[in-house]
């Protein structure tokens, strides 16, 4: 059988060859609308349904821990193993992004704008991923920025200062400066889908200092998020509520830069881990008890960071410069 990494672990735990919808959708062998393997797509790669694992929803039972392992670990017999989910789908369950209109922006190593949807509405031209969610009859749209906190950490290494120290010294949000950073350190996905593009600093002069370059990095990721946000409506997705998660969300400057670029408030959860592991635990609870999506609640919100309305025009102008600079940079490859 063809198994994804977590499904190989599942095979060892349960003896069952099973995959779940959200991860399997990324193989391109799944008919995402029908939530089933596609015989046509499998045939295009010389594969057949007989080679594929059984598909389940993330909240369904995929098997039980093998008796041998249960005995070794001191567990009762019959411990349920849920279908589970891919990293971002599980994070969405953890943070309560499970119904149309809800979304989160993750500022981790990569940047992700993830929006839940109650229908399959792809638009390949946008480079927005359209996959099955980890919950039944639910899909998601996802824009991906390959370098978010990764870009900040890269610059922090060059500056020889901790990333938190760099962002903590910035003070209140300012209009984007002339220095411009394109965060394509390893190519880019949404909306360009360009593996060859590479990053760049532009408009540097004698006055450019560490703080200006730090702001440029943060302000370079903000329009990248806006690109994903702007692509969503063509997939039929309208974002009504946005929550920020990930290490980068600890920087108020960065979150407000994104909020101002999107012209949309961003909510910050109270302290706690509401990521993929928490979402996986919720999926396990659903599988073990029959609980429904109602347990995937939104965490307590500590505060909301509003866009700076005095700066939305400046950030819109910076986004236009950012988009134009991509075209110029692409021509140099």
Where are these regions (language model features)?
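Active-site core segments that coordinate phosphate-bearing ligands/cofactors
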Residues: 1-19, 23-24, 28-39, 43-46, ...
